[in-house]
Amino acid sequence: LDSGVLGRLCAPVVERELEIWVVGLLQRGRKVLIPEVCDYEIRRELIRNRSASIAQLDGLAKTFEYLPITTPAIRRASELWAILRQTGVPTAPDDSLDADCVLAGQALVAAEAENRSVVVATSNVGHLVRMVDARVWQEIA
């Protein structure tokens, strides 16, 4: 899950379509992962806004599998960050951490570790699709 989808799952009232979609994935035995970088992006805003949704985010981390940031993932993210700039299509300013690169690095390393394909569920494929298989969440079954 990218931060857009994860954030919507943390809303006080989760959209019914999104809830049905994620429950369906779990029922079909699909892994639903919360990348640590996305947890960070959502959690910092929830803390800043003093939101009660932090408990919901913590609950999701218990329901879904948590994907920690690892050294191989950060190294892959660094490669992606550099390649995007070398080819003239950066996804964030040069002084930015660029969470999309970190998320893509996490996804690629997870795919290699498990020897299976990984699809990032997002609400905006624009940046992510340059680095990893990313699809609008409604298109993932």
Where are these predicted regions, by residue range?
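Short, mixed-charge aromatic SLiMs
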Residues: 62-67, 128-135
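A generic structural signal for short hydrophobic patches within well-formed alpha-helices
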Residues: 6, 39-42, 74, 128
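Short aromatic-enriched loop/helix-cap "lid" or pocket-rim segments at secondary-structure transitions
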Residues: 12-13, 46-47, 80, 131-135
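Histidine- and aromatic-rich ligand-binding microenvironments
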Residues: 1-2, 34-35, 96-97, 121-125, ...
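Short, well-structured N-terminal submotif of metal-dependent ribonuclease cores
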Residues: 1-34, 44-64, 116
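Hydrophobic helix-cap positions at the C-terminus of alpha-helices
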Residues: 24-25, 60, 84, 110, ...
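Short, hinge-like loop/turn segments at secondary-structure boundaries
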Residues: 49-53, 84-85, 138-139
